[in-house]
Regions:
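A short beta-strand-loop-beta hairpin characteristic of the jelly-roll/cupin
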Residues: 166-186
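Residues in well-ordered beta-strands of folded domains
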Residues: 143-145, 166, 176, 202, ...
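Short beta-strand His + acidic residue motifs that chelate non-heme Fe in jelly-roll/DSBH
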Residues: 153-155, 173-175, 184, 193-205
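A short hydrophobic beta-strand segment most commonly corresponding to one strand
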Residues: 163-166, 190-192, 206-221
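Non-heme Fe(II)/2-oxoglutarate
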Residues: 2-129
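Residues that flank catalytic or metal-binding motifs in active/ligand-binding sites
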Residues: 140, 159-161, 208
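Short, conserved beta-strand element in jelly-roll/cupin
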Residues: 146, 157-173
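A short glycine-rich, His/Asp/Glu-containing loop-to-beta-strand
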Residues: 127-149
């Protein structure tokens, strides 16, 4: 039986023995390492104000789930009720088993519909973030995503790319896109992540990680 990785180069035993003598780099694990699909933008917010806004918001609202929690920051215009379960997640694609065949999961979400800031956030720093982002790009669902310690997402791809603004993080919080792995520091920067490629998020640290994310509907495939 053949597998998709069979054509990859294999390390010879001689090279393997040489490799054993080389010490790995253990000092750069908390640094940002860009790739074609993960880029830091020249756009930055005040991390102290972001963390303060998050702490204040958590006194009023709860994350939707104990493991992969969501707090919506935008909504459909004049929306009166909460997001549906599908709105919290939305369409994604996986190659879920040994057949390596892609399948779609959950229903599509029209990201462009989520154009309005949730009204009770108008007096928060998240309103400033929303105003600045929409000045530079079209965004869809803007959410706070929490990832608890010792957890990971599925290996999947989305219909459109995302931006990430890390707020609470740790060196074990990693993003992997097309097998490229990097940490995203919580330094106030906006990070472009092309989540149209296969990706996952991992929190291998001791504390929860919280990112502000926003979908980019103009990148819909």
């Amino acid at each position: 039986m053949s597998y998709p990785g069979d054509k990859a180069d294999a390390l010879s035993i001689t090279d393997f023995q040489r490799r054993l003598a080389l010490a790995p780099n253990t000092e750069a694990v908390d640094q940002f390492n860009p790739s074609a699909e993960i880029q830091r933008l020249n756009l930055r917010f005040d991390i102290t104000k972001l963390r303060s806004a998050l702490a204040n918001l958590e006194q009023r609202k709860s994350f939707s789930d104990e493991v992969w929690g969501v707090i919506p920051l935008t909504q459909r215009p004049s929306q009166s009720g909460p997001w549906s379960d599908n709105d919290l997640s939305g369409r994604y694609y996986m190659r879920a088993d040994e057949r390596y065949e892609e399948a779609a999961f959950e229903d599509c979400v029209d990201e462009a519909e989520f154009s309005e800031l949730v009204p009770d956030l108008a007096d928060t720093y998240f309103a400033h973030v929303h105003e600045v982002l929409t000045r530079h790009m079209k965004i869809g669902r803007m959410r706070l995503l929490r990832k608890v310690a010792y957890s990971a997402n599925s290996w999947h791809r989305d219909p459109e790319p995302r931006i990430h603004i890390p707020i609470i993080t740790n060196p074990g919080s990693l993003l992997i896109v097309n097998h490229h792995c990097t940490h995203l520091p919580a330094d106030g920067h906006v990070y472009f992540t092309d989540t149209r490629a296969y990706h996952t998020a991992v929190n291998g640290g001791l504390r929860s990680r919280v990112h502000l994310t926003a979908a980019l509907p103009e990148g819909l495939l």
